[in-house]
């Protein structure tokens, strides 16, 4: 809503400046008794267009369905493959009636509650699990999230991140139950084989996601004086990011990291490190994990730097070390 308001206001002010509209028009769009810009939260996992869906549609006669990859490496097609589960939560601040979206399952509520639903989803119940699966899924050669959910280590990884580590600080919006929400994510949404989502898609722009998806949970532990030793698998996700940046899978074969605005910069930081090299200098990690713009806080100042550094050393031990390290920490929780 705020983004829409900013865009509309910018156009209106420029139009008034250029004499296209009267000055009163700007006052009109800023009058909250007449015009509002409701906040909203939508949650419906929508992967890239998948060739299996494309082939199914072609068999049904819809043949002109080619996927286009844009210059920004986004994917578009004349069809959308998405999941059945969906949530739409809207701020109820309409001034002259509103569409009865509640008849289709949408929720109308306050701005505060919309924000709380978004916080619940993005910092605890869905997005952190997605990112954990994307980082380790890429290194373990997975191309489907649903296939990852059949992997005992990965499934337990996200279950324990969600229920054990993130839930103690979850935001409960009231209109949706966090435990029911995350249960649907783990047991229904992510294992769905008919939703061909890929860890490579989710790994896009990971540097822009870590601060919200994990940094906020760490901050809440600190702010509330909670036992930081309860955080083990979230640090393992962040340790895995350093290993992911080397663009080598667990068999030491190269893979192409997903598009990310900070990819080159962060890869340069870990460039001195080699997978499988004994007794190397890991001091470059202080530069990586003190990046507040990436992690939301200086992880060394927060008391997690040395813990993460130790995990990174295990992940860099050599071929098979990603699986071995993941299994070790997940099974111990």
Regions found by a protein language model. Name each.
Residues 1-333:
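Substrate/ligand-engaging "lid" and interaction regions
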């Amino acid at each position: 809503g705020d983004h829409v308001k900013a865009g509309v206001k910018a156009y209106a002010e420029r139009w008034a400046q250029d004499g296209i509209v009267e000055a009163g028009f700007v006052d009109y769009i800023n009058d909250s008794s007449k015009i509002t810009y409701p906040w909203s939260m939508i949650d419906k996992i929508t992967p890239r267009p998948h060739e299996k869906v494309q082939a199914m549609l072609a068999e049904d006669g819809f043949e002109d369905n080619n996927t286009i990859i844009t210059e920004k490496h986004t994917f578009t097609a004349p069809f959308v493959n998405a999941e059945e589960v969906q949530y739409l939560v809207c701020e109820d601040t309409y001034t002259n009636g509103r569409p009865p979206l509640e008849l289709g399952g949408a929720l109308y509520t306050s701005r505060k509650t919309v924000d709380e639903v978004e916080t619940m989803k993005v910092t605890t119940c869905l997005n952190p699990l997605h990112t954990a699966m994307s980082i380790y899924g890429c290194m373990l050669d997975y191309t489907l999230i649903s296939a990852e959910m059949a992997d005992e280590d990965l499934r337990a990884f996200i279950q324990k991140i969600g229920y054990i580590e993130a839930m103690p600080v979850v935001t409960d919006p009231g209109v949706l139950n966090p435990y029911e929400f995350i249960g649907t994510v783990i047991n229904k949404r992510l294992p769905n084989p008919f939703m061909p989502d890929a860890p490579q898609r989710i790994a896009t722009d990971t540097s822009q996601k870590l601060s919200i998806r994990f940094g906020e949970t760490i901050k809440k532990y600190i702010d509330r004086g909670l036992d930081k030793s309860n955080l083990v698998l979230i640090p393992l996700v962040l340790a895995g990011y350093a290993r992911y940046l080397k663009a080598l899978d667990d068999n030491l074969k190269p893979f192409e990291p997903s598009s990310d605005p900070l990819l080159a910069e962060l890869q340069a930081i870990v460039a001195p490190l080699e997978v499988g090299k004994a007794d190397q200098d890991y001091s470059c990690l202080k530069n990586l994990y003190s990046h507040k713009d990436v992690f939301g806080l200086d992880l060394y100042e927060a008391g997690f730097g040395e813990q993460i550094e130790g995990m990174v050393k295990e992940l860099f031990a050599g071929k098979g070390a990603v699986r071995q390290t993941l299994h070790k920490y997940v099974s111990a929780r």
